[in-house]
Amino acid sequence: MILFPSVDKLLERVDSRYSLIMLASKRAHEIDKYRIDKWRAAHPDKAGETVSLEGDKPLLLDHYDSNKSVGMALEEIEAGLVTIDPDQHEDLQD
């Protein structure tokens, strides 16, 4: 159960709960990948491989109330920084 941001505020940004879940999930995966790649780049002796952060989608807010990637994704959605691409959304519905 999420307490912040509220589901009602989040649903003002997307058209359905399903869209909200899909958008938050995809963004959370991007955040996780960015954090892992950033850690690997900072610790090349422990990571075992070199990692380039070019092309990764960095964190969009300066401060997050949540430490978990799903919560961070929801905060970005509430701020209007992460949205559904209407062209891609229409393709999925066909």
Swiss-Prot record:
What family is it from?
A: Belongs to the RNA polymerase subunit omega family.
Assembly with partners or alone: The RNAP catalytic core consists of 2 alpha, 1 beta, 1 beta' and 1 omega subunit. When a sigma factor is associated with the core the holoenzyme is formed, which can initiate transcription.
Which gene is annotated as encoding this protein in its UniProt record?
rpoZ
NCBIfam families to which the protein is assigned, alphabetical: rpoZ
Highest taxon in the source lineage: Bacteria
What SUPFAM superfamilies does the entry give? RPB6/omega subunit-like
What keywords appear on the UniProt entry?
A: DNA-directed RNA polymerase, Nucleotidyltransferase, Transcription, Transferase
* Keyword Transmembrane set for record: no
Q: What is this protein called?
A: DNA-directed RNA polymerase subunit omega
According to the UniProt entry, its GO molecular function terms are: DNA binding; DNA-directed RNA polymerase activity
Annotated EC: 2.7.7.6
Q: Which organism is it from?
A: Limosilactobacillus fermentum (strain NBRC 3956 / LMG 18251)
Q: Which Pfam families does the annotation name? A: RNA_pol_Rpb6
InterPro entries cross-referenced by the UniProt entry: DNA-dir_RNA_pol_omega, Pol_omega/Rpo6/RPB6, RPB6/omega-like_sf
Describe the function of this protein: Promotes RNA polymerase assembly. Latches the N- and C-terminal regions of the beta' subunit thereby facilitating its interaction with the beta and alpha subunits.
Q: Name one GO cellular component term.
A: DNA-directed RNA polymerase complex
Task: Report if keyword Nucleotidyltransferase is assigned.
Answer: yes
Can you state which reaction this protein catalyses?
Answer: RNA(n) + a ribonucleoside 5'-triphosphate = RNA(n+1) + diphosphate
Q: Which GO terms describe its biological process?
A: DNA-templated transcription
